[in-house]
Amino acid sequence: MKHHLLLFSLLLIMLVPASAQKAGVNIFSYNVHNCIGMDKEQDYQRIAKVIQQADPDIVALQELDSVTERNKGVYALGELEKHTGMHGIYAAAIPFQGGSYGIGMLSKEAPIKYEVIPMPGREEKRALIIAEFKDYVFCATHQSLTAEDQLLSVPLILKALEGIHKPIFLAGDMNSKPQSKPQEMLGKQFTTLNDTAVYTFPADLPNRCIDYIYAYSQNGYQFDVQQQKVIEEAVASDHRPVQVVVQIKGK
């Protein structure tokens, strides 16, 4: 009888779908170029469709207008919230044409809390969003084009993460190649989760990786990358989006 019960239990385990097992965090990073594609068309629904098809839990977004003149007063993140059904966080980096220009975040789960931290940028100021969720903290940014500013940003990011005891992810357009000094500096504190040999920019004929997803490696958590890809979307924006599914392991 016990033998039959054991076999029955094993059969049930085998029949449980993978989705019912402990799922990884599906992370997405996308420089959306204010939803203007390589065809010069601005299309919020097209960008939203790219995001929806990937079905991410959390998204870092770069290059968003908020009620600017060139955007005809439209709040770009609001359009993406509407079309994806996700929660949005916007961070203005600079005032621009009667509104602002900055970065954003979309999430299936409403954040517990978040903060926006200014980041250096001599060509234009930058920003970092740090949002806390139930099981992790997610950070989104868009770094300066200047290597000196990128290097200055690293200690500011690390300072902002002090005292956080949950697993931490960071994602965004970092404007630096994998072998650069800023990436070397980040690599001492973070593990890069995406495959940097797969290029992300420009979208039509990519020849470099400048978009990244990282896990913070200094507060004891381990991470198992279950999936990593660059979405082969060549038109919707001037960057291709990066996607990683990662399982958080205990300390």
What is the predicted function of each stretch?
Residues 2, 18-83, 95-99, 248-251:
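N-terminal, active-site-proximal structural segment of metallo-dependent hydrolase catalytic domains
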Residues 7-15:
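Bacterial N-terminal signal peptides
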Residues 24, 39-40, 64-136, 226-233:
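Structured beta-strand-rich core segments of catalytic domains in phosphoester-bond hydrolases
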Residues 26-32, 47-71, 138-141, 157-184, ...:
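Active-site beta-strand/loop signature of hydrolases that rely on acidic residues for catalysis
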Residues 30-33, 62-64, 91-94, 107-109, ...:
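Active-site-proximal beta-strand/loop segments in catalytic clefts of secreted hydrolases
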Residues 44, 48, 74-77, 81, ...:
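Extracytoplasmic/secreted envelope proteins and their assembly/folding machinery
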Residues 52-56, 81-85, 89, 111, ...:
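Sec-exported extracytoplasmic/periplasmic mature domains
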Residues 116-117, 147-151, 159-169, 175-251:
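Metal-dependent phosphoester-hydrolase catalytic domains
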